[in-house]
Swiss-Prot record:
UniProt keywords, alphabetically: ATP-binding, Cytoplasm, Nucleotide-binding, Nucleotidyltransferase, Transferase, tRNA processing
GO cellular component, one term: cytoplasm
Family indicated by similarity: Belongs to the SUA5 family.
Protein species of origin: Mycobacterium leprae (strain TN)
Identification of the protein by name: Putative threonylcarbamoyl-AMP synthase
GO MF annotation terms: ATP binding; double-stranded RNA binding; L-threonylcarbamoyladenylate synthase; tRNA binding
Amino acid sequence: MVRMNEVFDCADPDQRARGIASAVAALKGGRLVVMPTDTVYGIGADAFDRAAVAALLSAKGRGRDMPVGVLVGSWHTIEGLVYTMPDGARELIRAFWPGALSLVVVHAPSLNWDLGDAHGTVMLRMPLHSVAIELLCEVGPMAVSSANVSGQPAAVDVDGARGQLGELVGVYLDAGPSAQQAASTIVDLTEATPRILRAGPVSVARIAEVLGVVPASLIA
């Protein structure tokens, strides 16, 4: 039985194991979890639980017009989530995953999820954080957004997340301060030409080099 608002110190092996198990139970029960990632802390739900994703948006005070992204625990997971692998996707995944790069792609039409008004697209990322990967490998793809109330700073530690989200979250996994302390770079691969929608830790120059394009062509 998962008690509400549990916090687990993942620096302690026993607490980490119990925390992962509690987070898995919470997610399977339709509850929300705060988890560490390499960029900022995230608030997450089972990506295929529509009610839980709606609760996530509500906890953040966010509308359907700002859909939730999805974190995955392995490279191959993306194959089952996309309609087709767009040009450049494999190159970017090989270069930057796991890491601070999110890719917007057209999702497979058969997927039974509702992440908000995403118009057939989904933002995917594989985080560079062992706790996040362990959880994702246990539960599968998770709908995850930054662990903050909309309009407030993204939390870079568990105390910042708890201060904003409190009892709305069932389990908090504490792994200390985020390494990057900045939201991921976002690249849109849904059109013929890749575009950077948000600057972040992965630079325009590095992305352009991998794609073999001029950096200026990536600026939205």
